[in-house]
Amino acid sequence: MVPAKKLKIAFVHPDLGIGGAERLVVDAALGLQEAGHEVIIYTSHCDKTHCFEEVKNGTLKVEVFGDFLPTDLGKRFFIVFANLRQLYLTAKVVLSGRSKDKDVFIIDQLSTCVPFFKLANNKVLFYCHFPDQLLAIRTNWIKSLYRIPFDLLEQFTMYCSDEVVVNSNFTKSMYKKTFKYLQKNPNVIYPCVDTDTETLINDRDMQIGNLLVGKCPNFYLSINRYERKKNIELAIQAFAKASVENTNLVVCGGYDPRIHENVQYLQELTCLCKELDLSYTVNHYSDFIEDSYSVNEIEKLFGAKVIFLTSISSSLKEFLIQNMQLLLYTPSYEHFGIVPLEAMKYGKPVLAVNNGGPVETVVSYQKEDNEKSTTGWLRSADADEWASALIESKEVLNQNPELFKNNGPKRVIELFSRKAMTQEFETNIKLALRHTSNISIIYVVSIIFAVLLKVFVF
């Protein structure tokens, strides 16, 4: 079921940059717009030099309110100022009359504004990527105490929504454990991936990619930010234990030399390679683009068993995914995880940890049982188990190179395409429009008072 009429839909998002949450908002807005609805995004910040192309080129209508307000005070009180900026945005939208003709507001990340839109008689659908309080760092009792009012307000402001949705069943389970006072049972709307496989690879990336494939025709690929929680060492340890002949490991991902953890973790990974007697090279993508290396020098850098690449372009990432043997997706308890879908859409198999989001995206191989639907392997985060899976994957691919070619794309189109996501949004929007609130005006006003007290006192 979908809404019977075309709707006026507004998104509210704190910072319209280039992160995963922003990609979801842009995809949802595009999908609903393509379905004939009138869509606008309200945000507190949007840098046209640091945003997705659909925002930059005007395909999506975006209005910014409150960008003049600070985001912190001396690198502190980020949550306070995030709430303050959203309250300013909300006031501008409501008091200017922009909210009057909107059929529904889709709000994500911060729920502070929800009771204000409800007081203005708007319908609200809240998209919960993950409970914010579970992401907050609490290094001491002062910070823990500081977070209490924000944690409570997250729960009670979200409760004012007409409908709440989450990005995976894993997030749904965490939602239920975290928001114990909420009676809402959220539906799941999976993020989508671009199903277009005719990606244009730029000339320099094509040259770099061909040089790598020429030296390493059979390689496993790991794509993650250089952060310890991504557990990249699991891929390296399993690769060393499996000792699959004529195979290399390419590790690439986000890296900022200004971030201490990025630098330190990459050093730890190279030390691990030394301990495991694996040759390695570290290659910074920016050096390739600036022509700091000749073709011959680049080719030499790709002669090691383990090849580290930092902050590669989307173009080169697409090339590597298209040409890899297997994706090694190492993080545990990922809220969702989009990279496995990026591999599956090209018909490439995935080896992932058997918890969190990948349990919902990857269909684990079972011999003579699910060969028409399998998209890879799911194993516990144990190097021995992963090594066994690598050996098995080599055998399976040697026997049936085309096994995953159709399974991955079919699953992505059915469950994780923009069309599928749009249909789910339309279904849940209809539920929000039909929802008859049993929340009293006294409750809403009380929550608004608490929000204002929280922001201006804490």
Curated annotation (Swiss-Prot):
The chain crosses the membrane at residues 438-458. Keywords: Endoplasmic reticulum, Glycoprotein, Glycosyltransferase, Membrane, Transferase, Transmembrane, Transmembrane helix. It catalyses: a beta-D-Man-(1->4)-beta-D-GlcNAc-(1->4)-alpha-D-GlcNAc-diphospho-di-trans,poly-cis-dolichol + GDP-alpha-D-mannose = an alpha-D-Man-(1->3)-beta-D-Man-(1->4)-beta-D-GlcNAc-(1->4)-alpha-D-GlcNAc-diphospho-di-trans,poly-cis-dolichol + GDP + H(+); an alpha-D-Man-(1->3)-beta-D-Man-(1->4)-beta-D-GlcNAc-(1->4)-alpha-D-GlcNAc-diphospho-di-trans,poly-cis-dolichol + GDP-alpha-D-mannose = an alpha-D-Man-(1->3)-[alpha-D-Man-(1->6)]-beta-D-Man-(1->4)-beta-D-GlcNAc-(1->4)-alpha-D-GlcNAc-diphospho-di-trans,poly-cis-dolichol + GDP + H(+). It is found in: Endoplasmic reticulum membrane. The keyword Oxidoreductase does not apply. Pathway: Protein modification; protein glycosylation. Gene3D superfamilies: Glycogen Phosphorylase B. Its EC number is 2.4.1.132, 2.4.1.257. It is a single-pass membrane protein. CDD domains: GT4_ALG2-like. Mannosylates Man(2)GlcNAc(2)-dolichol diphosphate and Man(1)GlcNAc(2)-dolichol diphosphate to form Man(3)GlcNAc(2)-dolichol diphosphate. This is Alpha-1,3/1,6-mannosyltransferase ALG2. It comes from Candida glabrata (strain ATCC 2001 / BCRC 20586 / JCM 3761 / NBRC 0622 / NRRL Y-65 / CBS 138) (Yeast).
